[in-house]
Amino acid sequence: MSPAPDAAPAPASISLFDLSADAPVFQGLSLVSHAPGEALARAPRTSCSGSGERESPERKLLQGPMDISEKLFCSTCDQTFQNHQEQREHYKLDWHRFNLKQRLKDKPLLSALDFEKQSSTGDLSSISGSEDSDSASEEDLQTLDRERATFEKLSRPPGFYPHRVLFQNAQGQFLYAYRCVLGPHQDPPEEAELLLQNLQSRGPRDCVVLMAAAGHFAGAIFQGREVVTHKTFHRYTVRAKRGTAQGLRDARGGPSHSAGANLRRYNEATLYKDVRDLLAGPSWAKALEEAGTILLRAPRSGRSLFFGGKGAPLQRGDPRLWDIPLATRRPTFQELQRVLHKLTTLHVYEEDPREAVRLHSPQTHWKTVREERKKPTEEEIRKICRDEKEALGQNEESPKQGSGSEGEDGFQVELELVELTVGTLDLCESEVLPKRRRRKRNKKEKSRDQEAGAHRTLLQQTQEEEPSTQSSQAVAAPLGPLLDEAKAPGQPELWNALLAACRAGDVGVLKLQLAPSPADPRVLSLLSAPLGSGGFTLLHAAAAAGRGSVVRLLLEAGADPTVQDSRARPPYTVAADKSTRNEFRRFMEKNPDAYDYNKAQVPGPLTPEMEARQATRKREQKAARRQREEQQQRQQEQEEREREEQRRFAALSDREKRALAAERRLAAQLGAPTSPIPDSAIVNTRRCWSCGASLQGLTPFHYLDFSFCSTRCLQDHRRQAGRPSS
């Protein structure tokens, strides 16, 4: 990869106010046209195709006979290109987009020179096609801004600045100056002599800068760089965090009548009056009349401060009026000074800035030109298709011909169908060590899952050892013989017996295998021997299967719990459940110095006292849970009885309720037991007369002899009884 090109050299900046008329940079000045080779300079004509005028001779020469041209060409702008990069850059130009819009509107197209002059002078009204340039209506102002936003984009070719003018002096230096400080607008084509004179006069002598945006106004009168007078206004006209002026908001939809909206409307009117009164004053009016340059920055919705209406301070067709071609901040006096300083700065280059920017552009790539492959013609394509069809036909006939020659040569091809099962358990880590599920399951489900997980884990280790060409029968073969051949040659029977017992949890078979020869070195070596490339031992297999009794027996027989598999996991970490892990902890409590339990990752011993405390804690938790459930059940039953009593009391008539209440009062006065209540369901008669809710612990609402739990029930009862609530 070639190194990145160096950045374009930075120009020297000099203020026009700091130069004298006989400064060296002004000696031998001349107006520079666009450099040859750029897209915008290759059109020495005044119209383009589609404009209804005669085509240029250059285009006729380019067109030639009616054949398919191999040149890169833009038919809209009548331009040719050397490579695709130049063509793509041309399609991004505002000039090309403008000509496309003009062609769609059946309007005359502009050449590169005309378009550059129109855009550099800011005379975009002619570009937009407006005929009435003297109209000062708000609709025309909106059209002007819309066209300006469309055609003044920053997607221009390298070194092309539409608002600047390029000069060259006798020393070979190139000077860039902003067009807006070189005198008023001129009808195209502009006279180079006037531009040179204005440049040598060191910028505008009398200049007025006006800016307005978002309730802010700033204006200043300059003589050179000296400030004659300045004024700023600020009114609250834009709602915070919305960014839209109140007047523009009202124009889009129904006006708001809030206090804030009314305040913003009042401030807009006040700001309009203040600015108009300021610019109509004697000092400002005289300055606007005598100024050689007027610089303006205002949004489309805020231009009514300066244009339109009675006594407008500015006229749209004024040749001294220029839009500020810079990005500006909030209108303040400091911003006015910054804008004037920026516009009156002269940039001096030692070489052509257009060519330098183009060469140093990251879009410029230097490539070796290779001869392109010649594209096949239609006749060649048809011939290729015929050859392919003939070849396919021969291939279809070849089996028939081959059947006859089979007997002669005595050669037969036998095809064998092989079924291959591809396992993907090695890609899933959870198959080796299942995740702990939060949902509680019964012991039968747990035992089945543990057994299946152990079989899947051991089967995965077997599949990792097998080559990819084995059939499904080899995959389904018993695990023992394969492990015997790999790890325990010479004693497969003992190995198979131990492995099968560990899988199934058969403690009796293990005792028979280990009891006759507890000190046999062969058995001791097999207890901690790895199972295949996975490095699983018998202790790993028993722990993964959740066989706690087998784990205890293997540990007592001498199995090493510190042996790790190929993934550096000891048997304790692959245990399927807590009971299996507890066997390691019990063995650690009985044999604290037998192994390095830190390496085995056993957290600590499990003593009988600890197990007793855990059992007691579980019993207490179980009893508390049972008591809590019984209490909740009693509470639910009580609430259900209360709801039933409430429904039955509310269903009684007023006469039955009065009789029941009188009976209760009489029984309370006499101290005698009350008679059974009908249906024996209404236990508490002190209830709301309307809804039947209990009044125990409440302060009831009364009227007459009735009691209610709320005013709503009281009003409902009165309405039902036909009595007014007042």
Curated annotation (Swiss-Prot):
Region (VCP/p97-interacting motif (VIM)) location: 654-666
Location(s), subcellular: Cytoplasm
Gene3D superfamilies: Ankyrin repeat-containing domain
Residue ranges of domain VLRF1 in the record: 203-346
Residues annotated as the enzyme's active site: 246
Residue spans of biased composition, Basic residues class: 436-445
Span list, region Disordered: 40-61, 120-141, 387-409, 436-474, 588-656
Keyword Transport in record: no
Coiled-coil regions listed: 609-659
Class of enzymatic activity (EC top level): hydrolase
Biased composition (Basic and acidic residues): 52-61, 610-656
Similarity annotation: Belongs to the ANKZF1/VMS1 family.
Subunit annotation: Interacts (via VIM motif) with VCP.
Name of the protein in question: tRNA endonuclease ANKZF1
Organism: Homo sapiens
Record gene name: ANKZF1
